[in-house]
Regions:
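Second-shell loop/turn segments in exported
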Residues: 38-44, 68-70, 121-127
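Short, structured active-site-proximal loop/turn typified by the sulfatase FGly-forming signature C/S-X-P-X-R
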Residues: 42-91, 148-152
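Beta-strand elements within well-structured catalytic alpha/beta cores of enzymes
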Residues: 26-38, 57, 83, 139
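Bacterial Sec-dependent N-terminal signal peptides
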Residues: 1-24
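His/Asp/Glu-rich, glycine-adjacent segments
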Residues: 96-242
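Extracytoplasmic/secreted cell-surface and envelope-processing proteins
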Residues: 39-43, 76, 159-163
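Acidic/histidine-rich, surface-exposed loop or edge segments in extracytoplasmic proteins
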Residues: 30-40, 116-120, 242
Length: 242
């Protein structure tokens, strides 16, 4: 009797599993990494978000409120390496944005690599210091190298570490010229990026840009200490990082 009951349950279980269609494989995967965006800010400013942005992600996605990595003293580079590889600096090798080169006794960037030239930059870069696989690399493996992986960021360490070892391209802003640049480690520099640099790069438009809150200051109810300090910044100087 017990044997028959167990067999019936298993049969029903397998039947139910077979009846469920497999989820469709996503054709596009987008990863956004925003430096200094704390989880409590996501909730505090939720009333200001559009319906198709953060609100949709929080409503339809999976939110992890207490995710931690077991290491301290993080900076941008070590944090991005940890997020994209799922490992700590002791495993992925990215202990900081910069460290002392044991051979030259001079500071070096975590993506410095003299073996490769830069495109629209004098900096030589590659992900050679990254010792582990990343989600971008695993996507390449899963698609048998048919997937396309690109990373775009304001800084080169963020772009290169996000693109991983097998990405198709990594692009970041040259802080001196305002043009998008890359490294010869990846495939040939796309013609459309060169065209954009020559016609529409931020360097041509930044003087007309104004950085200020998108909403009236009184709508930012969770920042009472800033309400008496209206923020407005123009990019019309010749300074680096303008």
């Amino acid at each position: 009797m017990k044997k028959g009951l167990i067999t019936s349950i298993l049969a029903l279980t397998f039947t139910g599993l077979q009846a469920q269609p497999l989820p469709a494989t996503p054709k596009l995967v987008v990863t956004l990494t925003i430096d200094q965006l704390r989880t409590d800010y996501m909730e505090a400013f939720s009333s200001l978000y559009g319906e198709k942005g953060f609100k949709r992600l929080m409503r339809e996605g999976k939110v992890f409120y207490q995710t931690e990595f077991p290491f301290s003293g993080t900076d941008r580079a070590s944090a991005i390496a940890a997020i994209y590889s799922g490992t700590t600096p002791s495993m992925n090798g990215i202990i900081s944005q910069q460290w002392m080169n044991a051979n030259t006794l001079r500071p070096m960037n975590c993506v410095d690599d003299p073996a490769f030239m830069g495109n629209f930059t004098d900096e030589s870069s590659s992900p050679s210091q990254l010792l582990t696989s990343t989600i971008a690399d695993e996507l390449k493996v899963a698609t048998r190298n048919k997937g396309m992986v690109y990373a775009i960021a304001p800084s080169r360490d963020a772009a290169i570490l996000a693109a991983g070892h097998s990405g198709n391209g990594a692009f970041w802003l040259n802080e001196n010229t305002g043009k998008w640049c890359s490294t010869t480690y990846y495939s040939e520099f796309p013609w459309w990026v060169s065209q954009y640099n020559e016609r529409q790069s931020p360097d041509f438009r930044i003087r007309d840009m104004v950085w200020e809150p998108i909403h009236p200051i009184n709508r930012y109810t969770f920042l009472p200490e800033w309400r008496d300090q209206p923020f407005k910044y123009k990019f019309d100087s010749e300074r680096i990082n303008k």
